[in-house]
């Protein structure tokens, strides 16, 4: 389901949310919320087992990750995706550029995380020749 190195999964396990099937407790879907800055996070690695797609499980994962972002005080959530329509249903909108102030950008440059490097669109990261779309959601404060 995921094409990530096992070490990466262990490093990021606390960021993940998973959905299990009731009948046999097997993994049905996953997704991660990676906080990049005090008010900015990325939704990463949303995946649903192929025979469980179309059942709303992926949407439930994203809803849970957005709820976690709100609890943490995150106000902007970013994703880099091919599933534009899927994320648009959650309010994400396509963006261009990097939506952070210059001083935050310079701090983020210190990160070793490849996802942060992709967010910053750094030259050392593979160019976006596949057509991924950068999307952003501005979260409203809870009432």
Give the location of each predicted region.
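A conserved beta-strand-loop-helix scaffold within acyl/acetyltransferase catalytic domains
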Residues: 1-16, 20-23, 28-49
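A generic local structural motif
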Residues: 3-6, 62-66, 121-122
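C-terminal "cap" of GNAT-fold acetyltransferases
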Residues: 100-143
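Conserved acetyl-CoA-binding loop-helix of GNAT-fold acetyltransferases
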Residues: 48, 54-69, 78-79
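Conserved active-site alpha-helix within GNAT-family acetyltransferase domains
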Residues: 71, 75, 81-109
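Beta-hairpin (beta-strand-turn-beta-strand) motif
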Residues: 46, 82-84, 140
């Amino acid at each position: 389901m995921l094409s990530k190195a096992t070490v990466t999964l262990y490093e990021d396990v606390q960021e993940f949310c998973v959905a299990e099937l009731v009948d046999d407790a097997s993994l049905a879907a996953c997704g991660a919320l990676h906080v990049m800055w005090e008010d900015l996070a990325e939704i990463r690695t949303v995946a649903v087992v192929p025979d469980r797609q179309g059942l709303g499980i992926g949407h439930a994962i994203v809803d849970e990750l957005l709820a976690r972002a709100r609890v943490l005080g995150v106000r902007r959530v970013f994703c880099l995706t091919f599933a534009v329509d899927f994320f648009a249903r959650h309010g994400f909108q396509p963006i261009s550029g990097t939506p952070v102030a210059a001083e935050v950008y310079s701090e983020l440059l210190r990160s070793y995380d490849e996802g942060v490097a992709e967010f910053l669109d750094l030259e050392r990261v593979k160019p976006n020749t596949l057509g991924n779309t950068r999307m952003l959601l501005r979260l409203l404060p809870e009432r």
